[in-house]
Amino acid sequence: MLCGVTVLFLRLFPIVAALMGCLGLIGCAHTPVSLTVFEALGIGKNVDAIKLNPKLRYLRVSTPDRVALMVLGYSVDSLEGAVETWYSSGGEVLKLQNGRVVSSAGLYTDWRSVKYSGLPTWRQVIDKKIAEYSRTRDQMPAYKFGIQEQLVLGAVATPDNTRLLGVSASALHWFEETVKGSQHGWPSARYAIGFKDFAPTVVYGEQCFANDRCISWQTWPASF
């Protein structure tokens, strides 16, 4: 299995490298300020105009002042849901499971080994509108290990301050996740759920890694 994953990544990496430089979403490990290849060439920040390879899957990732694309390297099935590993050519990695961040690397603030306990399915969340569960994670830098948090996930009205593109926000079910006992519920998250083949699917997500370090993502191009 590992050999197959390695071969796939080596095959994808030149394509990713040609697509963009350091992701620069909330920082890059080797430069304080990073631009994509397209910005460096003067084409600007509009990655939405890039011609996509139909054989690859893309993730549109953004912050308030920067947008970039990541490419799916591989997906590993598990009982809790497939873990998708997304890459940028600058070395940033984002792992998602059921639309939630379970690991990151190469950002200013990284989460590692994210584990949930008592996590409901998205269908259960949609039916009940609210849920509580726990999360354990490690955080870098500062070597914070085994951070334990109690989370509350609840339905919210359709927001008007998202970075969602190509999909009507009002057509989705919106939920906000907050940390109990923390100031303003940080680090918070937000999810938009739609139905694909009658199954609830995360169409759009936001995650704050710290009070001022937030990213959003959606599969690209928008197809819901």
Where are these regions (language model features)?
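C-terminal motif of bacterial Sec signal peptides marking the signal peptidase cleavage site
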Residues: G24-G27
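Acidic, serine/threonine-rich low-complexity disordered tracts
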Residues: A29-S103, S113, K129-F224
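Surface-exposed, glycine/proline- and aromatic-rich loop segments on solvent-exposed faces
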Residues: W111-G118
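Bacterial N-terminal signal peptides that target proteins for export
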Residues: L2-V16
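Homeobox/homeodomain signature
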Residues: I15-A18, A49
